[in-house]
Regions:
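Bacterial Sec-dependent N-terminal signal peptides
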Residues: 1-22
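Acidic, small-residue rich beta-repeat scaffolds with periodic aromatic anchors
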Residues: 17-62, 155-227
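Structural signature of eukaryotic scaffold interfaces centered on beta-propeller domains
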Residues: 26-28, 89-102, 152-155
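Beta-propeller blade repeat segments, especially FG-GAP/WD-type strand-to-loop junctions
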Residues: 55-58, 119-139, 174-180
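Beta-propeller fold detector
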Residues: 64-68, 135-142, 186-193
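Surface-exposed loop and turn segments in beta-propeller and other repeat-based domains
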Residues: 66-86, 192-207
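Repeat-based blade/solenoid architectures
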Residues: 72-93, 142-152, 170
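Acidic/hydrophobic-patterned starts of short beta strands in beta-sheet-rich repeat architectures
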Residues: 99-112, 156-161
Length: 227
């Protein structure tokens, strides 16, 4: 019986190792580095189920482990995933580190498929918690998964912004702030509608003293996009 258990363990390790490609993400954060194990790499594209292990850069201590159903990212023509432990560039990695909720701690977004609008990238978002652990955040994951890719982070205004699109001529940006309970709420939005002739209609909405203030402006297309 003992021999059977040992054999099964060896077989499991062998199959896991064969099925996964290994990468390093050492340049995405000043505080953290990561090892990435992903199921599939074909040509210049990697995807599928993946495990991400995050380490402290200074101490090499393992901080947390994450899983993604579809860790989708690309490789350059000179990178060969079969070599193992391939180091990914800062803007190539499927991991995004940053202070998303402006509490002074570095948070993490992990690529999980292309579930955004027009098949744009989607991300699972984790906020930093006590003892360097990360907690999943459903509100920010929704914002990073149902719009045009990852939200923008503006440190100066302490806002995050998502982008939406409907066809060729309708674009919307929604800006969010965080309340006392660290929950994002819509603070303002800008709609750009260029569906009528050569006119761009810009509709701005902002919450002022609990009320929505709305302004509508019209511009010549050539003037608006040359500003």
């Amino acid at each position: 019986m003992k021999s059977l258990i040992i054999f099964c363990s060896i077989l499991l390790i062998a199959n896991t190792s064969k099925a996964q490609f290994k990468f390093l993400a050492n340049n995405s954060s000043d505080q953290y580095k990561a090892k990435i194990f992903v199921d599939k790499c074909e040509g210049n594209a990697c995807s599928g189920k993946a495990t991400v292990i995050v380490y402290d850069k200074v101490t090499d201590r393992e901080v947390d482990t994450f899983h993604s159903e579809d860790l989708d990212f690309g490789l350059t023509e000179t990178q060969n995933a079969k070599l193992g432990w391939l180091e990914l560039g800062k803007y190539q990695t499927p991991l995004i580190f940053g202070d998303f909720n402006f509490d002074g701690l570095e948070d993490l977004a992990i690529r999980n498929g292309n579930k955004g609008a027009y098949s744009s990238p989607s991300y699972d978002v984790y906020l930093a918690a006590a003892e360097n652990k990360f907690l999943p955040n459903s509100e920010l994951t929704k914002l990073a998964s149902e719009n045009l890719g990852m939200f923008d982070v503006d440190k100066k205004t302490k806002q995050i912004a998502i982008h939406q699109k409907d066809g060729c001529c309708f674009d919307k940006t929604i800006n969010y702030k965080f309340d006392a309970k660290n929950i994002p709420y819509e603070d303002s939005s800008v709609i750009e509608d260029s569906s009528i002739a050569d006119i761009v209609t810009v509709i701005t909405q902002k919450i002022v003293d609990g009320k929505i203030k709305r302004t509508v402006q019209k511009f010549k297309m050539k003037d608006y996009y040359n500003q």
